[in-house]
């Protein structure tokens, strides 16, 4: 849970990209990153144990494709390694180090430097950070579409996951402006980050299998058994990648500027209406979330988002122009 909160804080720093100067943002991002890494050791082993269970079940309750006895033996060795690593708990020194890092960061907050000299109100405070996160995720997704899923490296998939997770954290911070619509985006982003998170863990398990030393007494059957195990894991990974890629197509269907323009309009409507207690009228962006009654589609095909698409032309450009004039 601590690591999740640290990631959320890093997403918040990225969201303030338009006004918090790069040096300040970079310094604090490194602090939060290093704090998370300090806490990651035993958690990483526990995550891989959970991934093993998703793939093959437990020793007592195996599941999935029936493993050859050689494959089952290899998985048993990997499981023992991970159980030993996961048993190591965080030391008092590590916890104290993280506490000191965060306390030091908190004392610096009053001295943070903002690019404009003041904290501006309005959605453009957040637009640059949102657009940057969305754009990076979209760029990496489009690379996969261009080169083909089978040619994408593990590092590229991991980057797509990181950007989807970051955008999800950022939209959670903004979800009050239109809960039903933004929850649909958040759910889709979670599906991408969870699916590619499993893929990443499965890749690490494959690496551990490859790192197991061969014995001089290993037979050809034992070597083939290891290869069959790797192929079994790879089939699961391909299904996860295909599912995540399909979700990413829905998330990144818009150009970054259009995505931010639409979110800016949502912000303005929320700020000028619902948040101030003004009468809740049906606007060009669709019904109030309380009236929607169902989850919206992140693609814009749902009722509310499709209405927003149809009306963020002149009205949306006017809203955005006003916001930019403030920034």
Range-by-range predicted roles:
Residues 1-295, 300-317, 323-327:
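Cationic, histidine-enriched alpha-helical/coil surfaces that engage anionic ligands
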């Amino acid at each position: 849970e601590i690591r999740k909160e640290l990631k959320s804080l890093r997403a918040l720093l990225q969201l303030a990209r338009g006004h918090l100067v790069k040096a300040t943002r970079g310094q604090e991002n490194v602090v939060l990153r290093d704090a998370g890494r300090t806490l990651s050791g035993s958690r990483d082993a526990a995550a891989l144990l959970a991934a093993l269970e998703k793939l093959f079940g437990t020793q007592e309750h195996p599941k999935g494709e029936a493993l050859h006895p050689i494959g089952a033996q290899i998985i048993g060795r990997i499981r023992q390694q991970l159980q030993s690593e996961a048993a190591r708990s965080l030391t008092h020194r590590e916890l104290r180090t993280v506490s000191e890092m965060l306390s030091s960061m908190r004392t610096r907050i009053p001295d943070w430097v903002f690019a404009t000299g003041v904290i501006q109100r309005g959605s453009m405070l957040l637009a640059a950070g949102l657009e940057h996160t969305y754009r990076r995720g979209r760029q990496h997704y489009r690379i996969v579409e261009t080169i083909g899923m089978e040619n994408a490296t593990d590092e590229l998939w991991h980057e797509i996951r990181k950007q989807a997770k970051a955008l999800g954290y950022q939209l959670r911070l903004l979800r009050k402006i239109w809960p039903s619509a933004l929850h649909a985006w958040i759910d889709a982003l979670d599906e991408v980050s969870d699916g590619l998170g499993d893929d990443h863990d499965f890749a690490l398990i494959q690496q551990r299998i490859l790192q197991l030393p061969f014995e001089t007494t290993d037979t050809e059957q034992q070597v083939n058994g290891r290869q069959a195990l790797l192929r079994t894991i790879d089939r699961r990974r391909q299904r996860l990648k295909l599912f995540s890629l399909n979700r990413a197509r829905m998330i990144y269907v818009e150009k970054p500027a259009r995505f931010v323009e639409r979110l800016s309009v949502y912000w303005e409507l929320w700020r000028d209406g619902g948040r101030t207690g003004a009468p809740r009228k049906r606007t060009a962006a669709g019904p109030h979330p309380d009236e929607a009654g169902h989850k919206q589609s992140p693609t814009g095909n749902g009722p509310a988002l499709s209405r927003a698409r149809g009306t963020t032309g002149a009205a949306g450009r006017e809203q955005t122009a006003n916001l930019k004039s403030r920034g």
